Amino acid sequence: MVGDDVDVAVVGAGPVGLSAALLLARAGLGVVVLERRPGPVTESRATDLHARTLEALTPSGLAESLLPLGRRVDAVEMWSGRRRLGGFDLARLRSPYPYILTVPQCATEGLLAAEAERAGVRVHRSTAVRSVDEDADGVTVRSDALGPVRARWVVAADGASSTLRALAGTAFRGRTYAGAWQLADLRVEDPSLDPARVHMVGGPRGLLVVLPMHLDGWARVVLHLPHGQVAGGGVGGPEGIAAEAAARGWTAAVRECRWTSTFRTHRRLAAPDGRRRVLLIGDAAHVCSPIGGQGLNLGLRDAVSLAAALPAATARGGPADAGLAAWRRARRADALGVLARTDLATRAWTLRSAPARAVRDTAVRGALTTAAGRRLLAESVAGPRPA
């Protein structure tokens, strides 16, 4: 049971929900977290943390805590099949964190859960929300494991298939991309694999991305599957993944597959609603293509900025608070920018016809031959600067 009213009920104990809960608790609000899963994730899942996100996490000390948990990737190489188009260095970014930090999601969640507990946040697992009833003063949340939870605000961080978004009746507009995606964490033998570089390979069979992971000899492989092989588990296990990667231009001996996931992806954005005490963040508010690993970063920036805006709105009154309205506008602008950039990249890197790919390759080569082009690409990976 949750015996007393709370300021904030966060629904979802992934990295976005836990970071919001932690930072809101540190700001002096009473926070509980409701999570339908029985335990934390044990897989790597979302791994990439970009420069602007780490900058946003710096004042809380979280960036410094995350650094030892990950590996720094400081350059991106772009290929058309086995032909190199060029590359760009992230080390030239004007940031204290001029790289991609790859941290397994299980490690990120573990750190955030421990810090949230120290801040007084209680996480209720195996607790699926069934209803939310909102009135002028707050929200009553009912679940299948607790009695009613009364909160002044509910933060929905329960993912792309958000129960809270559905219960609130909020439209989730956008489109589903053709084909499917397969992610796999592989132990590989490839002497040419640079642990500080990510490789993007475009070709007639689809996109291949190879990203070094936090452990030596391990790589995250991303495959776009134009024919949408979701039901059959994509191209299969280690042998199938290795064969498909080789057909796209990367040959390595795959020794082990620790985790793989096949899914469809979408470009969607929740409709704005400034009257509600149910606040959507992370994938509950927006989903984008996996190209560039931007989804987790966008959600973490949602959480950090909400923790700055919500305490004042709580003190002053309600959903119409000017600071909270400004937060909504800023987050929507950030999301629209990320969705536009990832959509452009997805369309460009999943082209299948030879003439279209030739045009893309010419444009990419041209951009990579100039310092301004390389800087623009690095900034697009790093994420938007705070307004």
Where are these regions (language model features)?
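Glycine-rich FAD pyrophosphate-binding loop
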Residues: 25-46
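Conserved FAD-binding catalytic core of PHBH/FMO-like flavoproteins
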Residues: 114, 153, 157-265
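Core beta-strand elements of the Rossmann-like FAD/NAD(P) dinucleotide-binding domain
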Residues: 6, 144-153
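C-terminal helical "tail/cap" subdomain of flavin- and related membrane-associated enzymes
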Residues: 309-387
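Beta1/beta-strand and adjacent pyrophosphate-binding region of the FAD-binding site
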Residues: 2-16
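FAD/FMN-dependent oxidoreductases across multiple families
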Residues: 233-298, 315-321
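A conserved short coil-to-beta-strand element within the FAD-binding core of flavoproteins
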Residues: 125-139
